[in-house]
């Protein structure tokens, strides 16, 4: 059995609006053209080695609750209370059908692309479920494929990568996060995210190490 047969890869939100390369509306520092190429090259190698590839895609309606533009008097990056929940407000990003929402890797290499954040009432950092608890098809897809272990990376370390990795672990998968194939919004929250993931039993590797991934 090849090492990758029961191992899946989730590439998180590698979309134009999250990159400095595409001058995205919610660009993550360091997510430049070189970083995107590094992620694309690593993802191609995982494919060659028999890993099953999945992607998440932020896919918001214009009326999405997380957009500061939908909250008169509020500004991006403010936190507000909505129905008892704390909601961080963001610039409009990854609006359905826009260039900024497009995945920057070849879509053809993925077994499936799981869209998230389509419900205007709830944010969705995780590829498994939104903040309201509504599940995506991710867990069903992975279990149908017999995936037991997941390699997770992308944008951003301290938000959607962390949320996806934590939910993957909660759903019973062995999870490995590749720090060098991810970028975070801020250094302090990124460091905290890495520690939080480790505390939940998630393995964090600095870079791709096929032997360690196979052994974990």
Where are these regions (language model features)?
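Active-site acidic carboxylates
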Residues: 1-117, 144, 148, 169-177, ...
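Aromatic/hydrophobic pocket-lining residues that form the small-molecule binding cavity
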Residues: 35, 39, 135, 161
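Short, well-ordered secondary-structure micro-motifs
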Residues: 66-67, 124-127, 163, 188
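Short, surface-exposed loop/turn motifs that are enriched in glycine and acidic residues
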Residues: 92-97, 124-131, 154
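Histidine/lysine/aspartate-rich catalytic loop segments that bind and position anionic ligands
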Residues: 107-145
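Glycine-rich anion-binding loop/nest that anchors nucleotide
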Residues: 147-163, 177-182
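Buried hydrophobic packing segments
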Residues: 164-168
